[in-house]
Amino acid sequence: MKTNIIPTDGMVITEDTTFAPGTYALPNGITIGADGVTVAGEGVLIVSPQQVGVGVAAQGRRGVTVRGLSLNGFYHGLRFDDCEGVTVQNVNVRGTQEIEGIDTFLYLWLPIEKTYGGAILLNNVRGGTLLNCDLQHQMNGVLLYNTSGVTMEKCNASFNSGWGVYLSNANENTIQDNQLDFCNRVYRRPEDGSIRVEADAAAIVLVKGSSRNRFLRNSCLCGGDGVFVAGYEHPGVVTPCNDNLFEENDCRLSPNNAIESTFSRGNIFRRNDCSRSNYGFWMGFSWDNVLEENIVEFNRWVGIAVEHGHNFTIRNNRIRLNGEGVRLWTRSAVGEGVMPYWPGYEVAYDFTLENNLFETNHTGFMGYTGEKITDRECRAFHLRGNTFRDNRVGASFSRVQDSTLSDNQFVSNVEAAVRLVGKPGVTVGANTFEANAADVAEI
């Protein structure tokens, strides 16, 4: 091992190396040029003045480790391509390339050749660990392209103007125990000049079929979205992000959606806090999803919103103090927007809601077919074993068929426990009604 080495601009490292503490201007960075190499640098800061190039790069290497370095001012702080078994530990990255601000809406589907700047980029990497890294105050924290088997743990990628963690065609990775707070972006809408926090910034983003990943115990507070899963690029590019697990993440305080997961199948959302946002969950055009044991409170519009979705299980959630607790509905007309690319998704159907608490919402449950769909209706909404307490309306149905209410408790709902608009096809079975203004109101 080489120790106390003064790094030089563009140097290639082929054996274990520890740099001497200090600040070094290396606009061409350094390259790891052999397998099994460790580069260490406690007290070392490597800088570039122009936000171009890469601070530490490796291509086609195995078993490389970077530990303890600080980097500032590159396009990417660290970049690994076509590698296996990469470890990045206790690294600090700041000041990587960032696009212009208020008038730029982010594009979620950039190819690797045009990727945004960021602290760490892994492309076509198999296996690795990102541990205890500080990746705050730039555009993006970690970018994973075509990468699998990587664990990102105990990193801080907060206060970024794009994404904390971004996955594009990235599968079977684990993202756990990270701080990914305040990843948001101010955007001026060109049509009217209004300014909002949006532009598809988020703590966690999945695109291009990123599947079978695990997201555990991450803090995603105050993101543009907390989590954004986007399985479709308009027009006609269908790449669902399937079979991911989101468990015990804190996604509160988004001005948009605590969790948005669209056009994707088989995702599980368990014990997340999706509160104090415009929407807790936005789940359009998704299917075969499970939402269980989540906290969904104080959302401005809707706690759980699913348009044009099907085959959901929504169980054991605490759904309180929202505008609407759960909304299942249709919005688009046949032939409009994305509908030509999603045949069979004209209505919402096959939902099971069981053992949830709906409390102090304006409307606990809302199921309806929108006015733009005229030749068919939503169907098979089955609500059983739920408690509806102190809502203005417990459960409301309009233009819905083959649906059931059974074994639910309706207590102290202010206007009605159940509201049926226009004689929908809803069977009200054996439920418990207590102290409601009306038990079943037909309008």
Give residue ranges: language-model regions.
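Extracellular beta-strand-rich solenoid/capping regions of secreted or surface-exposed proteins
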Residues: 6-14, 25-38, 47-67, 71-87, ...
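Detector for repetitive beta-architecture
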Residues: 10, 16, 23, 29, ...
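Generic detector of contiguous secondary-structure segments
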Residues: 21-34, 68-94, 154-183, 200-223, ...
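Acidic/polar low-complexity surface segments
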Residues: 47-57, 77, 89-123, 128-132, ...
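Ankyrin-repeat and related helical/solenoid repeat scaffolds used for protein-protein interactions
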Residues: 359-360, 366-430
